[in-house]
Swiss-Prot record:
Function summary: Catalyzes a transaldol reaction between 6-deoxy-5-ketofructose 1-phosphate (DKFP) and L-aspartate semialdehyde (ASA) with an elimination of hydroxypyruvaldehyde phosphate to yield 2-amino-3,7-dideoxy-D-threo-hept-6-ulosonate (ADH). Plays a key role in an alternative pathway of the biosynthesis of 3-dehydroquinate (DHQ), which is involved in the canonical pathway for the biosynthesis of aromatic amino acids.
GO biological process, one term: aromatic amino acid family biosynthetic process
Protein name per its UniProtKB record: 2-amino-3,7-dideoxy-D-threo-hept-6-ulosonate synthase
Cited Gene3D superfamilies: Aldolase class I (3.20.20.70)
Short name of any one Pfam family annotated for the protein: DeoC
Active site residues of this protein: 33 (proton acceptor), 153 (proton donor), 184 (schiff-base intermediate with substrate)
Entry's EC annotation: 2.2.1.10
Catalytic activity: 1-deoxy-D-threo-hexo-2,5-diulose 6-phosphate + L-aspartate 4-semialdehyde = 2,3-dioxopropyl phosphate + 2-amino-2,3,7-trideoxy-D-lyxo-hept-6-ulosonate
The keyword Amino-acid biosynthesis appears for this protein: yes
Keyword presence, Transferase: yes
Family the entry assigns: Belongs to the DeoC/FbaB aldolase family. ADHS subfamily.
Keywords carried by this UniProt record: Amino-acid biosynthesis, Aromatic amino acid biosynthesis, Schiff base, Transferase
Listed GO MF terms: fructose-bisphosphate aldolase activity; hydro-lyase activity; transketolase or transaldolase activity
């Protein structure tokens, strides 16, 4: 894949091929790590059901904490990639923006992971600790040939707008500079400004799905715009696992990301 030409680690390349579509060179990831931060949300009470639905819908990978492997494993062979999330923090904490490391790259390998992810809140009062973790874990990932996804979110006392193009661009660049292979961050809400974010980041960017949108059309149009602006995929949780038709919305996203179909055409995948 051309976007990974700068990666010389064969182990990383092999694993990246498992979570990126060969033809489109893009990915659809379904994060399911919300149980740690927010508790047993609707759509995640039985992770195996949700994993089955998104796999049937064509998602390239699911992302979650190591408990996802035990409670959400399909047992159907390799039909969907696995990304182990290494960071944790809860809404019950005095500082919800603080994320700590709760597992290791080696543990993720034992669990069969195709990649690991790390959460960094850029601008949080403890952001320097998360920067340190990202830098050190990127070295471990390099040693083991494990792709690293950095979730770079502008959040903190000085952040007035989490979608501000300048702060999103800074957050994305920061993640790439500290060693991440893939960046997950906010879509700015506008294709032109997001193009500038992409230009300023040497690592491919996957957009976050964000809070649940009012309509499917609104959400899918965001995905469409982001892909045309240079995004290399989408990582969407609540807009997928809390949907009435999890398989259908996953398939609709895949149609846009991998086949570049129009939103109206993609909406036909949703049956409920």
């Amino acid at each position: 894949m051309k976007m990974f030409d700068n990666i010389k680690n064969v182990g990383k390349l092999i694993r990246l091929e498992r979570i990126f579509d060969k033809k489109s060179e893009k990915t659809v990831i379904i994060p399911m790590d919300h149980g740690v931060s927010s508790g047993p949300l609707d759509g995640l009470k039985d992770m195996r059901i949700t994993t089955n639905a998104v796999a049937d819908g064509g998602a390239n990978a699911v992302l979650g904490h190591k408990g996802l492997v035990r409670h959400g494993h399909r047992g159907y062979g390799r039909d969907i990639g696995l990304i182990i999330h290494m960071s944790a923090g809860t809404s019950l904490s005095p500082d919800p923006n603080k994320k700590v490391i709760v597992t290791t790259v080696e543990d993720a390998m034992r669990l069969g992971a195709d990649a690991v992810s790390l959460h960094v809140n850029v601008g949080a009062e403890t952001d320097f600790e998360m920067y340190r973790d990202l830098g050190l874990i990127s070295e471990t990932c390099e040693q083991w040939g494990m792709p690293l996804i950095a979730m770079m979110y502008p959040r903190g006392p000085k952040i007035e707008d989490e979608k501000d193009p300048e702060v999103v661009a800074h957050a994305a660049r920061l993640g790439a500079e500290l060693g991440a292979d893939i960046i997950k961050t906010n879509y700015t809400g506008d294709p032109d400004t997001f193009k500038e974010v992409v230009k300023g980041c040497p690592a491919p960017i996957v957009i976050a799905g964000g809070p649940k949108t009012n309509t499917d059309e609104e959400f899918l149009q965001m995905v469409k715009d982001a892909m045309h602006a240079g995004g290399k995929g989408v990582a969407s949780g609540r807009n997928v696992f809390q949907h009435k038709d999890v398989k259908g919305i996953t398939s609709a996203i895949c149609k846009i990301v991998h086949e570049d179909v129009e939103v109206k055409e993609a909406l036909k995948e949703i049956k409920i």
